[in-house]
Amino acid sequence: MFDTKKVLELANKDFEKAWITTKDLIKDAPINKKYPRIKPSFGKTNPVMDTIEQLRQAYLRMGFEEYINPVIVDEKDIYKQFGPEAMAVLDRCFYLAGLPRPDIGLSNDKIEQIEKLGIKIDSNEKKENLRKTLHLYKKGVLEGDDLVYEIANSLGLSNEMGLKILEEVFPEFKNLKAESLPLTLRSHMTSGWFITISEMMGKKPLPYALFSIDRCFRREQKEDKSHLMTYHSASCVLVGEDITLDDGKAIAEGLLSQFGFTDFQFRPDEKKSKYYTPETQTEVYAYHPKLKEWLEVATFGIYSPIALSKYNISVPVMNLGLGVERLAMINHNYEDVRKMVYPQFYEQTLSDRDIAYSIKVDKVPVLDELKDLTGELIELCVKNKDKQSPCEVFIEKKIKFYNTTKTIKITLFEKEEGKNLLGPSILNKIFVHNGNIFGVPESFDNVKEEFVKVLSEAKNKGAPTNLTYIDTICYKITSKIEEALISNTKKLKIRAPIVRSLSDVNLKIDELALKQIMGNNKVIDIRGPVFLNVKCEIND
């Protein structure tokens, strides 16, 4: 915080001077808190959920009402809808199963086993309570997840002892096997529409325009890049006396044009499902101008009067359905549905920006005075980098360290004749391009021709870190000085000859980024001569 009264006093005396000098009140960010080593934090949605919401809004804009269809479908409904081909269809359905309730009595042998656990059943009341609990469970009155608690409660025991009784006295529970039920998980939205429409007939005036977007489950032989065992169906129905196949074409165009598709083709579907009227099952192909190709995106048809009659539905019903995942793959440019739906099971790809964010300065001083000294040292290096050797330049500064004042003198030197004070790579900058990390020089004059194109692309198209070699090395120097202050060391020397790795320029990279670079055979190439020689003296 700064003193506002003092600032205003200075401004009243000399505004221009105050305007310039008060810039020092706004502190610069620490080196590892400067952009691009900071980035905005925000949540991320899944493409499937995005597409579901887009489809919901698209249907609503077209005047459809949203309904939730039953997920659990009795197998008899599959027979009603598919007729003779029901058995083949049921092969792709998941059946539900449940554990039977064992008929467990409380015999004298069971009571003896309980008492061997150190539990006294010394009254008829306790026996009756336990017997009643087991009976209620058998009849389905008592839920399975309450059984341990109720066993313990009937005998006045802790939950732990109730569980022990269940495990050691009633092994029947361990041997239970699930028994199949005549109930299936919905394999396609049509199974739910027949049930829904049947219930709505006579309750709501015709016509109906309904849609539902929800999960379906299909027992695929295996999952691959285009098939999952659970997927989302975006399905709609038009129900009314004058419904025709042309309504399906219009709905398909109206819906899909909201997702960037332009031209449409309607082709007879060779599958010919029995719940559709013959010659009405139609595949929708749509042209996507960005992808420049025709894509199969939906199917529609008119439900068979035979199937409708089994549900007392006496008017035509047009049904259109499409796979949400299919549309999401098109819109988000995915080739494998598994990677889109379940990204957590696959390697995450870091962008160049992400990698640039992951590169940090390793050693940084904590004291503000040393951070300021770092900036002054960088200026000294840049200003004198081309000074001819033998030569030396120095910077001297007093800083407060606990209750003492220390004088720090940093000297840059080069003793060998005919050289510059510093090597030609000190102003190289770090860029990330195509997953590679490069040290890019200011000028390409002395760069081998074979490297010019790569380095030029990195400079012009890559993600910058805004870090030069001299910046990061100077932070290492002042960090070493801070360590010397703490250990009461008076003198130290630091050399930075030829750079070969990130650590040579006081940089580190997050493990995930490094793993990606190595795993994808990318490179970290920041080679370059720095030839920096430093000696430091610390005096009271």
From Swiss-Prot:
<feature type="binding site">
    <location>
        <begin position="275"/>
        <end position="276"/>
    </location>
    <ligand>
        <name>substrate</name>
    </ligand>
</feature>
<keyword id="KW-0648">Protein biosynthesis</keyword>
<dbReference type="InterPro" id="IPR005246">
    <property type="entry name" value="O-Pseryl-tRNA(Cys)_ligase"/>
</dbReference>
<dbReference type="GO" id="GO:0000049">
    <property type="term" value="F:tRNA binding"/>
</dbReference>
<dbReference type="GO" id="GO:0043816">
    <property type="term" value="F:phosphoserine-tRNA(Cys) ligase activity"/>
</dbReference>
<keyword id="KW-0030">Aminoacyl-tRNA synthetase</keyword>
<dbReference type="InterPro" id="IPR045864">
    <property type="entry name" value="aa-tRNA-synth_II/BPL/LPL"/>
</dbReference>
<dbReference type="GO" id="GO:0005524">
    <property type="term" value="F:ATP binding"/>
</dbReference>
<protein>
    <recommendedName>
        <fullName>O-phosphoserine--tRNA(Cys) ligase</fullName>
        <ecNumber>6.1.1.27</ecNumber>
    </recommendedName>
</protein>
<dbReference type="InterPro" id="IPR041590">
    <property type="entry name" value="SepRS_C"/>
</dbReference>
<keyword id="KW-0436">Ligase</keyword>
<keyword id="KW-0547">Nucleotide-binding</keyword>
<feature type="binding site">
    <location>
        <begin position="233"/>
        <end position="235"/>
    </location>
    <ligand>
        <name>substrate</name>
    </ligand>
</feature>
<dbReference type="InterPro" id="IPR006195">
    <property type="entry name" value="aa-tRNA-synth_II"/>
</dbReference>
<dbReference type="Pfam" id="PF01409">
    <property type="entry name" value="tRNA-synt_2d"/>
</dbReference>
<feature type="binding site">
    <location>
        <begin position="188"/>
        <end position="190"/>
    </location>
    <ligand>
        <name>substrate</name>
    </ligand>
</feature>
<feature type="binding site">
    <location>
        <position position="319"/>
    </location>
    <ligand>
        <name>substrate</name>
    </ligand>
</feature>
<comment type="function">
    <text>Catalyzes the attachment of O-phosphoserine (Sep) to tRNA(Cys).</text>
</comment>
<dbReference type="InterPro" id="IPR002319">
    <property type="entry name" value="Phenylalanyl-tRNA_Synthase"/>
</dbReference>
<dbReference type="GO" id="GO:0006412">
    <property type="term" value="P:translation"/>
</dbReference>
<dbReference type="Pfam" id="PF18006">
    <property type="entry name" value="SepRS_C"/>
</dbReference>
<comment type="similarity">
    <text>Belongs to the class-II aminoacyl-tRNA synthetase family. O-phosphoseryl-tRNA(Cys) synthetase subfamily.</text>
</comment>
<dbReference type="GO" id="GO:0043039">
    <property type="term" value="P:tRNA aminoacylation"/>
</dbReference>
<keyword id="KW-0067">ATP-binding</keyword>
<comment type="subunit">
    <text>Homotetramer. Interacts with SepCysS.</text>
</comment>
